[in-house]
Amino acid sequence: MKRPRPQPSRPRGRMVAAMAASAGLVAASPALADSCTVSVPTLAFGAYDTINALTGTTTVTVTCTHTANPATRFNYVLALSSGPGSYASRQMTGTGDTLTYNLYTTAALTTVWGDGITGGTATVAGSFNVPGGAGRSGNDSQTIYGRIGAAQNVLPGAYSTATPITITISY
């Protein structure tokens, strides 16, 4: 007599994408029944004048494709690593100098976007519906707010984050 095969439960997916202050990357990781990608364009601050703070933004887009018939609601959480430096002071290097900056969860620039575990950091959560039907997809976007603090006496030149900041998505 044959035993029925146990049906696997759908695990929570986990995906990692890398983002540097001067470069954006796309990465994907399939879950059992669905696949999601994270797209992160470059966060380019522009010209820094050493007297005033400088802000910039970029948008993280989460896109999931459904492989089954019923409609699905995707809930996700985005966490960022500290990259080089720490959550208190992320760093870009160039021309022999270091320029400190940070990434925030809102335009108010009060809560550092991090892992949600390390003191004072928070993650960003979102959700969206994907209609039923194989190959149907949906997406949601979150804004990353960046700020370079004022009064950093650095030489002119191009600055970038040599070690990428990692974005982890749990869904």
Identify the residue ranges that each predicted region occupies.
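Substrate-binding/active-site groove segments that recognize
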Residues: 99
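N-terminal signal peptide c-region/cleavage motif recognized by signal peptidases
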Residues: 28-30
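N-terminal small/polar-rich segments of proteins
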Residues: 32-96, 129-171
